[in-house]
UniProtKB/Swiss-Prot annotation:
It comes from Thiobacillus denitrificans (strain ATCC 25259 / T1). This is Adenylate kinase. ATP binds at residues 10-15, 123, 132-133, 203. Gene3D superfamilies: P-loop containing nucleotide triphosphate hydrolases. Catalyzes the reversible transfer of the terminal phosphate group between ATP and AMP. Plays an important role in cellular energy homeostasis and in adenine nucleotide metabolism. The lineage of its organism: Bacteria, Pseudomonadati, Pseudomonadota, Betaproteobacteria, Nitrosomonadales. Consists of three domains, a large central CORE domain and two small peripheral domains, NMPbind and LID, which undergo movements during catalysis. The LID domain closes over the site of phosphoryl transfer upon ATP binding. Assembling and dissambling the active center during each catalytic cycle provides an effective means to prevent ATP hydrolysis. Pathway: Purine metabolism; AMP biosynthesis via salvage pathway; AMP from ADP: step 1/1. Residues 30-59 are annotated as: NMP. Pfam families: ADK (PF00406), ADK_lid (PF05191).
Length: 217
């Protein structure tokens, strides 16, 4: 099972990725983790990436694809792999295709912007313990206070409505075109084209999980 998981910030990709990894016995491929591992190992690609990052630059798609190909040769990828957060752009998707990285399914978890804003901007955190709440879905017993200590809860900067809206803007501009790219490729039915599956990300996490599993077969 070789797949790409797409969806906006707050769509629930992380939760569903864990279910998929467990069911199919496949690793989640994170480009951030790969970069750190290659730099730590002192590989040629890792050193190139480190030099670029140290200079404040963005690591090129060529280097990332090289790391992806190396990562997929490792033993834990024998049953497949799950990409979450990569590719982010059409050029990255094209580079993966050109490099012959096989993909069986592209799964999009679809959640409307208004729902994502409600989910993320309603989160509250107790900093010392890491306990999380939600003003609508999982409220504390006393508004704004941690259930255990009674201490104040905070809203993280990442969860503020303006920040969430900016992240959604970036997603729509950069990553959402991938939905069309993979949908069109799947529709053409070319050899090597992945199957494209759109799943509603609204509802209980178990229902969403079961919908994904049913689609993957």
């Amino acid at each position: 099972m070789r797949l790409i998981l797409l969806g906006g910030p707050g769509a629930g990709k992380g939760t569903q990725a864990n279910y998929i990894k467990e069911k199919y016995g496949i690793p989640q491929i994170s480009t951030g983790d790969m970069l750190r591992a290659q730099i730590k190992a002192g590989t040629e690609l890792g050193m190139k990436a480190k030099a670029i990052m140290d200079a404040g630059g963005l690591v090129s798609d060529d280097i990332i694809i090289g790391m992806v190909k190396a990562r997929l040769q490792e033993a834990d990828c024998k049953n497949g792999y799950l990409f979450d957060g990569f590719p982010r752009t059409i050029p990255q998707a094209e580079a993966m295709k050109a490099a012959g990285v096989p993909i069986d399914y592209v799964v999009e978890i679809d959640v409307a912007d208004e729902e994502i804003i409600k989910r993320m901007s309603g989160r509250r955190v107790h900093v010392a313990s890491g306990r999380t709440y939600h003003v609508v879905f999982n409220p504390p017993k006393v508004a704004g206070k941690d259930d255990v200590t009674g201490e104040d809860l905070i809203q993280r900067d990442d969860d503020q409505e303006e920040t969430v809206k900016k992240r959604l803007d970036v997603y729509h501009a950069q990553t959402e075109p991938l939905v069309k790219y993979y949908g069109d490729w799947a529709a053409r039915g070319e050899a090597g084209a992945p199957k494209y599956v759109k799943i509603s990300g609204v509802g209980k996490v178990e229902q969403i999980r079961d919908s994904i599993f049913a689609a993957l077969g």
